[in-house]
Amino acid sequence: LTSIGQVADLFVNNSLALEVQCSGLPISRLQLRTQAYSEAGYQVLWLLGKDLWLKERLTNLHKQFLSFSMNMGFHLWELDDEKKELRLRYLIHEDLRGKVHCLTKVFPFGEGNLLDILRLPFAKQALSHLTCPLDRDLPRYIAQQLYYKSPNWLALQAESYSRGENLLTKTAEEWYPHIRLPRSAIGFAQIQKDLTLVYQDFDQYYGNIEDKQKQVLYPPIIYRKPM
């Protein structure tokens, strides 16, 4: 693509650029590369190499590779050259400890239509869900984080004090839902959709749940209020 000074690893149907990203890069660089594709009329999909595979935590860089669909929520793609497979990590959520919860679909190389596979998050499909037990040890974890002066938890405690509350007195049930949608203070480079209503629907859905002994994670389409 001489017009934007970039070389895609693969083009699909002359409108979708596939980029294999094997190592970390500055978020600002990723944002610029994504924007350049968009302005040239191309959609770009990032396939993450081994060093960037999703592990226990969602880094700030990972968040800039996230895509979003109502049927599969936040998701990203991993390329595994050793196992000869493409992996879709979807329904990506974070708990209050910062740990990732998600589901995975595996696509062996050479099986199926590549474009159909890449379109799967946006295709009509049977919807998946993920069930997680209540984190009963969360209050102790939060007390520990405050003791060691974790900046994030100290900031939340300051907010809590301003409302006349104290994080240390909250029970595990009062923290429900423990597992939440990813958030990014700088937005998401790959997502143009305004997610305000998605977050609102999520909060309202779990605010109405009476059984707080478990949390069932659904695709965002499930949280949408009936018209």
What are these regions (language model features)?
Residues 27, 33-34, 39, 43-45:
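Basic (Lys/Arg-enriched) interaction patch that binds polyanionic ligands
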